[in-house]
Amino acid sequence: MTVTQTNLDGILPLVARGKVRDIYQVDDNMLLFVATDRISAYDVIMENGIKDKGKILTQLSVFWFNLLSDVIPNHLVASSDKDIFAKLPEQLSEPKYKAQLAGRSLLVKKHKLVPLEAIVRGYITGSAWKEYKKSSTVHGLPVKSGLQESEAFEKPIFTPSTKAEQGQHDENISPEQAAQLVGEELCAEVAQKAIALYSKARDYALSRGIILADTKFEFGLNENNELVLVDEVLTPDSSRFWDAKKYELGRSQESFDKQFLRDWLTSHQLNGKEGVSMTEEIAAKTAAKYKEAYEALTGKTWA
């Protein structure tokens, strides 16, 4: 069953519907994060979904939250269906609701969000490569000359962006601009934690034959104003993963993500257009990439 939108008939209030997640309020302190099978490209959500995508994103996030818990606390309250349904209204255990929620939901603690996308880059690619070719900078930061496409930076760099409303574009900003936005002390802590998280994840991924080129973290503040890791973590939606065996300096790399979909949209001049449905072949190839990423990173077979 592919779930592109949840409908809980008002049993829990819907707080937000993002590009992928439907978020419900459980009580004053808790939210239910439901990762649907929606997929977007070029800031447009496709009409049809990718089978099991939401489940893979959810299980991969749980895997990383556990692996990285010694670096920073996270917002997880419950991640197993048994524990989640025990804390939800009984009605939601009925088959029509359970089918929408099982395997793709997380019960999380509510936090005050830090209004930054904490992007960490270990390799020069994508928009960073485009900027570097023009100005030898990345997010306005001077970077050493002579780098080739997909080359590793000497050290991972923190390149934040603003958190845009849905339908708007996140805007790349310099660390100095980020400090003006959230305060110097908080910005420095976000940068330090984001780089520590990236570094641990990069080393683990490399041990599994995967290069973590870059990723995006989001943070919140708890009641004691301490930093907490929130949202999703190190999924193909928030990260660029490359196969280490196929890595080749001086060119763009194939990612474990929705590149098939982007390429198909571009070749048919559909990028940025609303109301587009993927072909079965493109949906299946994209689903296979998400599954491949899960299996490569966790060492588990996706059932």
Swiss-Prot record:
Coiled coil: none annotated. Keywords: ATP-binding, Ligase, Nucleotide-binding, Purine biosynthesis. Pfam families: SAICAR_synt. InterPro entries: SAICAR_synt/ADE2_N, SAICAR_synth, SAICAR_synthetase_CS. Pathway: Purine metabolism; IMP biosynthesis via de novo pathway; 5-amino-1-(5-phospho-D-ribosyl)imidazole-4-carboxamide from 5-amino-1-(5-phospho-D-ribosyl)imidazole-4-carboxylate: step 1/2. It comes from the Eukaryota. The keyword ATP-binding applies. GO terms for cellular component: cytoplasm. PANTHER family: PHOSPHORIBOSYLAMINOIMIDAZOLE-SUCCINOCARBOXAMIDE SYNTHASE. Belongs to the SAICAR synthetase family. This is Phosphoribosylaminoimidazole-succinocarboxamide synthase. The gene is ADE1.
